[in-house]
Amino acid sequence: MGFSETRAYSAWGAWSTWLTICLALANLLPVTAKSAADYFVDSLPGQPEGPLVKMHAGHIEINPETSGNFFFWHFANSHIADKPRTIVWLNGGPGCSSEDGALMEIGPYRVTDDHMLNRTDGSWDEFANLLFVDQPVGTGFSYVSTGAYVSELDEMTSQFVTFMEKWFELFPHYEKDDLYFAGESYAGQYIPYIARAILDRNKKESVQAQNRQWNLKGLLIGNGWISPRHQYLSYLPYAYREGIIQGGTDASLRVEATISKCMKKLNVEDTTGTIHIADCEDILQTIVDETHKGNRCINMYDIRLTDAYSACGMNWPPDLKNIEPYLRYKNVTEALHINSDKQTGWTECSGAVGGNFRALKSKPSVELLPRLLEEGLPILLFSGQKDLICNHMGTEDMIKDMKWSGGTGFELSPGVWAPRQDWTFEGDSAGFYQQARNLTYVLFYNASHMVPFDYPRRTRDMLDKFIGVDITDIGGNPADSRIGGEKGPTTSVGGHPNSTTAAEREKEKMKSAAWKAYYKSGEVALIVVAIAAIIWGVFIWRSRRQKLRNSSHEYRGIYPMLGSSSSGSLPRFSNKRGRSADDVEAADFDETELDERLSRAVSSRSSREHEPYAIGEEDGSDREGEGSDERRGLVDKS
């Protein structure tokens, strides 16, 4: 092996050693976390013509010890009003998927019989971003290790706050939006607990120091399971009013017997343990059983309908038969970034989640509402008139007994209650409004347990009023909505407003957030690059030093133009005093020798000053042409 080959082999050996060290150090660094781009949904099977609503979907880990992951589906707003808003929607159960809300209630699309998607007229994404979350763990597309299900409301709340913190890390440009929580049924327990946790979180010094408070602006709960005591005791009065059960009959006596058992249980229970009481659950079941005729029974979610016994409403709404197969298609789950290794198929409601979530140690959320209202948080409760399971009479009785801000129920002053104001929408009698001291109640006539399923346009009008959207300065076709005969703020349901100024503000906000995200995501890469640069620098320094020790060629590091043999360069330094080579960096020669050699080289160059300068010379025409090629290449790549 020759000297040059030995030197090359030595250099490669050194380089490979340092490369191995660099890779080992890189492996010690944490794996780069997912970015928002990893959750982007660029298309959906069956999507309608035209641009798809901007959306992101996928899993976020909230408990690594139990493999607990929440699934979310986020839809960006279609237009911006005066400011950006985000609405988090939760379905109930417990254990029922929020994809019900996304595809049957307030989301931008609904699934047709042939599994196509149709745009919903009156969807809530017109002026607000929508975030649907499958929770607790194990619900819908969310997953968790077997046996690690949540059983109490404080556990659920803690996991949900963790999810929100991680979600805002992925999507920081939404963190300062006005934030609302909405949902129905058992979400009447979830939402007040989450709201309480957010308000408490905002008071922490660590959160305030980082300016990471969340702008919680209001809650909307439809047909909510908020006060179990009031709901249990409202079943028979509601059944009497709606003609489901006739008073003085054997059927009514059987129902009254179950109520007596429930009352005994309620009278011995303390504040906690009253969210789920088996003896009280029997009241609803007895009423439903009394409607059993042939193979049919009443639909407990919409008393205008019947269902096969013993489903009695579990097969409703009719869109469910389209949604379940659609959400199980492989190309749909792939588009939504579902982890196929952990989630085998979408189910509307999980028996395992519901069976474990008994909240036996949790107090009912009705006890949280007064303080939330007193702290200035607006709350809107709405009910569908034809729902039995979470009927409006139970909600109204709860409000009547609730005390907050120095009054009881909707008292304006002692003995004076806020009036019920008739609500008409597009010429039809839609229901009534009642409001006092931060609480609003809306009853929807002829509506079921899932009011947005029946009336998407009316619920959108209700939403826009509650969150303060006024299209007067935005544009769009106003909806004819009147409360107590007054039009109030102008809303636009299903219109196409123009909001250029607000859109520009949102664009700038997202641009700023994007830069912050880039800086954050680049931290790990920057560390790796810095380590690699240091190692590479050390390697180059050592290689050059070794080269100077072993090279038989002249040193060109001080005056490069004197090192060209073609133009009278310095003669190579010869071995002296037993040295194999002169080490310039180590000053392995005396100054007199260097002066003599430089003097001879300069004299030699002076005698040939008439020769053309050739060191590093480039042909200008070739350089210009090369630049042109590079520019053409850039154009091609773009």
Swiss-Prot record:
EC number(s) stated in the UniProt entry for this protein: 3.4.16.6
Spans traversing the lipid bilayer: 521-541
Enzyme class: hydrolase
UniProtKB keywords: Apoptosis, Carboxypeptidase, Glycoprotein, Golgi apparatus, Hydrolase, Membrane, Protease, Signal, Transmembrane, Transmembrane helix
Main localization (coarse): Golgi
Record membrane topology: Single-pass type I membrane protein
Role: Protease with a carboxypeptidase B-like function involved in the C-terminal processing of the lysine and arginine residues from protein precursors. Promotes cell fusion and is involved in the programmed cell death.
Family indicated by similarity: Belongs to the peptidase S10 family.
Protein name as catalogued: Pheromone-processing carboxypeptidase KEX1
Single GO MF annotation: serine-type carboxypeptidase activity
Signal peptide: 1-33
GO biological process, one term: proteolysis
